[in-house]
């Protein structure tokens, strides 16, 4: 229900959101409205549909009758998830990382690119105005070597999801080793 509230906030502030995208990305406002801003509701609606079909506790052996006690697999939140997003198509990356993490019951710390923080600031406002409890979605701004490195090494962060350069992805992977974090990387770009 709270994540649906983010969609309500998006719908109320669509023009403002598209203008922020246009300013950050240098995209024409029509393109921001038609192609970039719709990423948030599209991904969110799809995650909400998928969420309804997740079997959070399921039998280890689904062929066994369910009327008898048996071992089960329980899906549980990982905990605190660090989300590091790139400068390009930032709203797409925020939606792909933050929405499923919150639906799974995780708390998030989002560090957007220092070159495109406006989308993340608006998303944080959407979360606040939608009634997401304090501490569930957190926003930190700053550069990769400073803030990104802190997220990657912090002992309370259980997982890092990073999209960006191969060089930075390597650094994040190495930094996360000491705390045995789960790491997901989408790499490309400039080295």
Which stretches of residues belong to each language-model region?
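Long amphipathic alpha-helix in the N-terminal Rossmann-like dinucleotide-binding domain
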Residues: 4-15, 29-55, 67-69
């Amino acid at each position: 229900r709270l994540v649906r509230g983010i969609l309500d906030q998006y719908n109320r502030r669509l023009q403002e959101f598209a203008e922020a995208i246009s300013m950050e990305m240098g995209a024409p406002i029509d393109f921001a409205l038609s192609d970039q801003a719709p990423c948030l509701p599209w991904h969110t609606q799809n995650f909400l549909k998928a969420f309804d079909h997740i079997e959070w506790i399921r039998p280890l052996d689904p062929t066994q009758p369910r009327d008898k006690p048996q071992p089960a697999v329980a899906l549980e939140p990982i905990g605190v998830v660090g989300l590091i997003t790139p400068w390009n198509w930032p709203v797409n990356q925020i939606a792909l990382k933050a929405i499923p993490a919150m639906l799974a019951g995780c708390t998030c710390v989002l560090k957007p690119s220092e070159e495109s923080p406006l989308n993340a600031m608006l998303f944080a406002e959407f979360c606040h105005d939608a009634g997401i409890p304090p501490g569930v979605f957190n926003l930190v701004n700053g550069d990769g070597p400073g803030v990104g490195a802190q997220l990657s090494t912090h002992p309370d962060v259980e997982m890092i999801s990073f999209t960006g350069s191969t060089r930075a992805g390597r650094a994040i992977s190495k930094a996360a080793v000491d705390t045995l974090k789960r790491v997901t990387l989408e790499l490309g770009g400039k080295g």
